[in-house]
């Protein structure tokens, strides 16, 4: 059970992210190596030369299915500090011309991620090092931040040799910190103005914004990145050069709209505000965000309600008067007994995962009224109702050109 009283008035907090692991990729060929394995363009990090910048990425299999997601940043120790000599050749201790990156990943797949990076090392002059024990990762959740510039606290943290960066997926996820172990006590003192919360709170907020993370939600080797909104979370550069698994992602993007996407959902509770009530900054990104509660009533009132099991089918209907009737080939088919109705279709809507009544669901886009989410009705197989929440990336989705050509 989660303590509702502890969440009702939270506007900002700091969260130690203990479920993250860090891999350093360093050497003359570090950029080349990572550039050939990731969905995003790391040249932007190299050209920017700022440790205030990070990039969201996916690492793919050769068939284009996602292995794991990551946040990659420049190694502050190398780019702004005094890098330790790393020998790339016998007798060499010259660090000139070296690049060094920190790859931030889900701890549960550290071993697999290390193996994947080493598998394609070939003759690249790089070292791949687990540096998890050297750092602590923190997130500052605060909807009012749009940049880390001109903030005295963050300037001081940088003097403490911390990497301070906006979360690259969306500004609503606030600020990420990479804190060297020998600076942890000092940094915790500087962050004392923020209430410290457990990582469960971070994950609850992240899920409510429609942001998947980690192997539990991304299902290693099984999913198409764009169905999990990599394009809407700044995780793909469609104009970079070739990389492992590129063909499927590029073809899905350039052929047309995908049919399914991940959406945030919450167990429905009556007599709370409309699901279409959003932060103005989500509706219109040009407007500055207001200081507001991290968790609105529609989430607080649903906490601790039982959500559907992972990978269970959902029944989804768009009740908008303007919504065209589905073609008969797409109509759901009921299977099973009358007492236990299961609904399936060619592209099944399903609940992916959740915590405390909030979760992620894979839904057919044609069933979602993205301009008025209240017109989307969702039930699980036991007829419990779920509400589709307004994700942080909704403005990007509504701006996409709706074309009749779609791909699965």
Swiss-Prot record:
Q: Main site of residence?
A: mitochondrion
Transit peptide per record? 1-74
One GO cellular component term: mitochondrial matrix
Its BP terms in the Gene Ontology are: iron-sulfur cluster assembly
Arranged from A to Z, the UniProt key words for this protein are: Mitochondrion, Transit peptide
* Location within or outside the cell: Mitochondrion matrix
| An annotated Gene Ontology molecular function | transferase activity
Q: Does the keyword Glycoprotein apply?
A: no
The family annotation for this protein states:
Belongs to the GcvT family. CAF17/IBA57 subfamily.
- Name it: Iron-sulfur cluster assembly factor IBA57 homolog, mitochondrial
User: What taxonomic classification does the UniProt entry list for its organism?
Assistant: Eukaryota, Amoebozoa, Evosea, Eumycetozoa, Dictyostelia
Gene name for this UniProt entry: caf17
């Amino acid at each position: 059970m989660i303590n509702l009283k502890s969440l009702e008035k939270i506007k900002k907090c700091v969260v130690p992210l203990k479920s993250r692991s860090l891999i350093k990729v360093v050497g003359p060929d570090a950029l080349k190596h990572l550039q050939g394995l990731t969905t995003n363009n790391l040249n932007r990090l190299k050209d920017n030369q700022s440790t205030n910048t990070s990039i969201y990425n996916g690492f793919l299999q050769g068939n284009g299915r996602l292995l794991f997601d990551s946040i990659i940043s420049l190694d502050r120790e190398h780019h702004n500090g005094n890098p330790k000599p790393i020998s790339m050749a016998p007798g060499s201790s010259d660090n000139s011309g070296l690049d060094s990156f920190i790859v931030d990943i889900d701890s549960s797949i550290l071993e697999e991620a290390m193996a994947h990076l080493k598998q394609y090392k070939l003759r690249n002059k790089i070292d791949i090092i687990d540096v998890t024990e050297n750092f602590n990762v923190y997130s500052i959740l605060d909807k009012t931040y749009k940049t880390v510039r001109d903030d005295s606290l963050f300037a001081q943290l940088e003097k403490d040799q911390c990497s301070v960066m906006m979360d690259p997926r969306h500004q609503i996820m606030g600020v990420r910190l990479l804190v060297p172990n020998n600076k942890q006590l000092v940094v915790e003192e500087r962050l004392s103005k923020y209430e410290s919360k457990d990582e469960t709170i971070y994950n609850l907020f992240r899920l409510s914004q429609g942001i998947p993370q980690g192997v539990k939600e991304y299902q290693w080797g099984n999913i198409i990145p764009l169905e999990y909104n990599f394009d809407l979370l700044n995780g793909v550069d469609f104009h970079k050069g070739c990389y492992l698994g590129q063909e499927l992602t590029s073809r899905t993007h350039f052929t047309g709209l995908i049919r399914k996407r991940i959406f945030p959902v919450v167990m429905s509770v009556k007599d709370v505000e409309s699901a279409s009530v959003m932060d103005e900054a989500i509706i219109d990104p040009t407007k500055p965000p207001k200081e507001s509660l991290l968790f609105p009533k529609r989430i607080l009132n649903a906490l601790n309600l039982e959500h559907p099991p992972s990978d269970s089918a959902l029944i989804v209907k768009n009740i908008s008067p303007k919504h065209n009737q589905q073609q008969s080939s797409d109509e759901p088919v009921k299977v099973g007994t009358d007492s236990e109705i299961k609904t399936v279709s060619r592209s099944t809507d399903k609940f992916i995962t959740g915590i405390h009544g909030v979760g992620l669901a894979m839904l057919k886009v044609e069933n979602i009224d993205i301009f008025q989410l209240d017109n989307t009705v969702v039930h699980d197989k036991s007829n419990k109702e779920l509400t589709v929440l307004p994700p942080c990336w909704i403005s990007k989705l509504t701006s996409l050109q709706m074309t009749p050509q779609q791909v699965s």
